[in-house]
């Protein structure tokens, strides 16, 4: 997971990795970022969500107009860079340790094991690490955007 996420208003977020026939390491992060039910919906459907929905879910900190994205991001980065370095490091480490205490590291290890199993399965079936039709499915989904129209 990222420390701070700033998105433009026109950004869309999706995770169509299931179309590849395997899981990715991102599987472990979604429940932490957006909750279990939304994580399952995003992974099972591959449907995109808007930047505002991502913000409402806690996946994004700020949503700004595309024309303001660089300026907003640089202002925030400059503000953070002016903070006492040791205090920033301690704050980040504290939050990261809290996540570790809640099981994020264990989740990552489990996701990696499942990812290896998925790739091995696809190699046995298709002699490739991913579902052969997956790329086309993902391209089709990307063209559709955040319409939430299921086929």
Model-derived features with residue positions:
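C-terminal alpha-helix plus adjacent terminal tail
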Residues: 49-51, 71, 78, 82-151
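Crotonase-fold acyl-CoA enzyme core
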Residues: 1-88
């Amino acid at each position: 997971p990222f420390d701070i996420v700033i998105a433009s208003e026109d950004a869309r977020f999706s995770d169509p990795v299931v179309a590849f026939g395997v899981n990715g390491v991102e599987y472990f992060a979604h429940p932490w970022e957006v909750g279990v039910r939304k994580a399952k919906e995003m992974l099972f459907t591959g449907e995109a969500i808007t930047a505002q929905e991502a913000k409402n879910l806690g996946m994004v900190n700020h949503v700004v107009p595309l024309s303001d994205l660089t300026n907003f991001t640089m202002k925030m980065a400059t503000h953070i860079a002016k903070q006492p370095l040791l205090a920033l490091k301690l704050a980040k480490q504290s939050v990261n340790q809290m996540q570790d205490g809640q099981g994020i590291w264990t989740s990552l290890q489990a996701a990696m094991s499942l990812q290896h199993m998925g790739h091995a399965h696809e190699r046995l079936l298709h002699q490739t690490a991913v579902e052969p039709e997956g790329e086309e499915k993902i391209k089709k989904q990307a063209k559709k955007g955040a319409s939430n129209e299921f086929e």
